Curated annotation (Swiss-Prot):
Residues bound to Mg(2+) 2: 38, 153
Enzyme superclass (EC): lyase
Keyword Kinase part of the UniProt annotation: no
UniProt GO BP: riboflavin biosynthetic process
Gene3D superfamilies to which the protein is assigned, alphabetical: DHBP synthase (3.90.870.10)
Name of the protein in its database record: 3,4-dihydroxy-2-butanone 4-phosphate synthase
Manganese found in the keyword field: yes
């Protein structure tokens, strides 16, 4: 990742701390992965606090595939089957079947409806009957161990939410350019600046976790 582009956001450790502060303040974070991986930036928000306005921003500027990152325990609690039994996608992204809140939504497409679906899925006592399938929110099952196991946006989202003190659940969507192409690091960083988002890389998060968990052990 081009460190010159990221230098205005601090050192790798500072970027993680600023990202955690942003999440606690109810703001979004732009998470970048490696240039030799997907080379994309994902907007992420805590599932607990994401607003309708933030969802609308995500839908307007993102790929349209609004994903809810969850743990395996939550997937089992909601009885969500994986989308396919044999995952042959390039990076093994853990899609489950799509979901919609069973109550409180109309078509499920609007920003408000998608927030309602997210809240229904992460509620403490959520049960399978609280959700209809299919729907317009795409759950992603994170790998246990987070970014130390798999360097994906899904795992980064769960790790960041956990470190920030939230439930291990977050919403992500890939940033796209106005012409429909995928936004790369320069566009992602510019967008983050325009929308008061922190910027962090998965590489930053790996280093942060390794350092902090080494201290604990």
């Amino acid at each position: 990742m081009n460190q010159t582009l990221l230098s205005s956001f601090g050192t790798p450790f500072e970027r993680v701390e600023l990202a955690l502060d942003a999440l606690r303040e109810g703001r979004g974070v732009m998470v970048l992965d490696d240039e030799d991986r997907e080379n994309e930036g994902d907007m992420i928000f805590p599932a607990e606090t994401m607003t309708v306005e933030q969802m609308a921003l995500t839908i307007r500027h993102g790929s349209g595939i609004v994903c809810l990152c969850i743990t395996e325990d939550r997937r089992k609690q909601l009885d969500l089957p994986m989308m396919v039994q044999n995952n042959t996608s390039a990076y093994g992204t853990g899609f489950t079947v799509t979901i919609e809140a069973a109550e409180g939504v109309t078509t499920g497409v609007s920003a408000a409806d998608r927030v309602t679906t997210v809240r229904a899925a992460i509620a403490d006592g959520a049960k399978p009957s609280d959700l209809n399938r299919p729907g317009h929110v795409f759950p992603l099952r994170a790998q246990a161990g987070g970014v130390l196991t798999r360097g994906g946006h899904t795992e980064a989202t769960i790790d960041l939410m956990t470190l920030a003190g939230f439930k291990p659940a977050g919403v992500l969507c890939e940033l796209t350019n106005d012409n429909g192409t995928m936004a790369r690091a320069p566009e992602c960083i510019a967008f983050a600046g325009q929308h008061n988002m922190a910027v962090v890389t998965i590489e930053d998060l790996v280093a942060y976790r390794l350092a902090h968990e080494r201290k604990v052990s």
